[in-house]
Amino acid sequence: YFMWEKIMEFGKEFQIQPYGTEALSTLRIEMGHVAGSELDGRTIPYDASLEGLVSKKKDFIGKRSLNRSAFTSTDREKLVGVVPIDKTTSIPEGSYIVKDPKAKLPNPKLGHVSASCWSVEYDNPFSLAIIKDGKNMIGQKLFAMSPLKNKTIPVEIVSSHYVDPEGKRVR
């Protein structure tokens, strides 16, 4: 307890604030930073907007694989953001993203919601999803369907970088 008090005292001039793991998770989702739920073993750097981390000059393990046809397909699932149209309904993690919720089964899914939070910055729910042709779907109105929660939520596809997309706050 003594150490905690001292840290808070010394940090006053820097306006430090304590936070927990849930706050850390919310920050990562709002910023579009990927974690375990987005990295499922099928995801490559280009799917998660991490192409800047892939060397164009140096050789590395897996470089040759990135040029295989399965990884260069234009309709690969990509990381995007998802916001409910009504700005109030939370989107359950694991929900399917579909064009038409009334389509005959099996309803062709475009992807799935990987993480959800309440955006403190914008005061509405926000989710990350991995969907086919993701970057070209930004601005589209689709549906998030959760069979487990028996919910169908009209959503809009947005950038995965919901808060501070230019990265000005971290500089």
Feature annotation, model-predicted:
Residues Y1-R171:
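Conserved, structured C-terminal
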